[in-house]
C-alpha cells in the first residue's frame, strides 16, 4: 500500500525573468517538511515547475500524492497539455519545442513514479499552506544562491 502524502507548492520571481525561488511543503500524517531554494535568473513558470519537481523527487518510495498548486500553467500542463506534447515529440500546436522542456520532461519522469492527484488552488485567498509556500518562495527569491542552468539554454 502506498503512503498518502500531501504536497503544497509555489514559485516566485522578481522581474520575470529575474531572481526567483520556490517553496514546498510535504506532509505525511503528522510529519511535515519544508523546502525552498532561490535562483539568480529564472522565470515564475520555471519556479512553479521546480517546486513540484523537487517535492516529488523528495519521495523515496512510490506514493499516492495530492499536489496542491496555484499555477494554472503547471496545472493545465500536467492534466491536459503534456499528453499531446509527448505525442508530438514535445512540440506545441505551432510545432515548436515547448518552453521549459527540461523541467517538463523531469516532471514527467518523476510523476510516473507515483499516483498523483493534481489540485489547483487560488493563490492569495488565505489557504494556509499555499500562503506559507508563497512566503518560502519569496524569501528564497530574495536570497538566490543557485543558477538555473536550463533557463540559459
Curated annotation (Swiss-Prot):
Q: Which SUPFAM superfamilies match?
A: Ribonuclease H-like
Query: Keywords assigned by UniProt?
Result: Cytoplasm, Endonuclease, Hydrolase, Magnesium, Metal-binding, Nuclease
* Protein name in the entry: Ribonuclease H
Q: What does this protein do?
A: Endonuclease that specifically degrades the RNA of RNA-DNA hybrids.
As recorded in Swiss-Prot or TrEMBL, the protein's gene is named rnhA
Can you quote the record's cofactor note? Binds 1 Mg(2+) ion per subunit. May bind a second metal ion at a regulatory site, or after substrate binding.
Q: What is its EC number?
A: 3.1.26.4
Specify the RNase H type-1 domain's residue ranges.
Answer: 1-142
Give the Pfam families listed for this entry. Answer: RNase_H (PF00075)
Task: Name the enzyme group at the top EC level.
Answer: hydrolase
| Annotated Mg(2+) 1 binding sites | 10, 48, 70
Cofactors that this protein relies on = Mg(2+)
Report a single Gene Ontology molecular function: magnesium ion binding
Q: Which GO terms describe its biological process?
A: DNA replication, removal of RNA primer
Q: Identify the InterPro entries for this entry.
A: RNase_H, RNaseH-like_sf, RNaseH_domain, RNaseH_sf, RNaseHI
Q: State the oligomer form and interacting partners.
A: Monomer.
**Principal place where this protein is found?**
cytoplasm
- Spell out the GO cellular component terms annotated for this protein, sorted alphabetically and separated by semicolons: cytoplasm
Spell out the PANTHER family in the cross-references.
Answer: RIBONUCLEASE H1
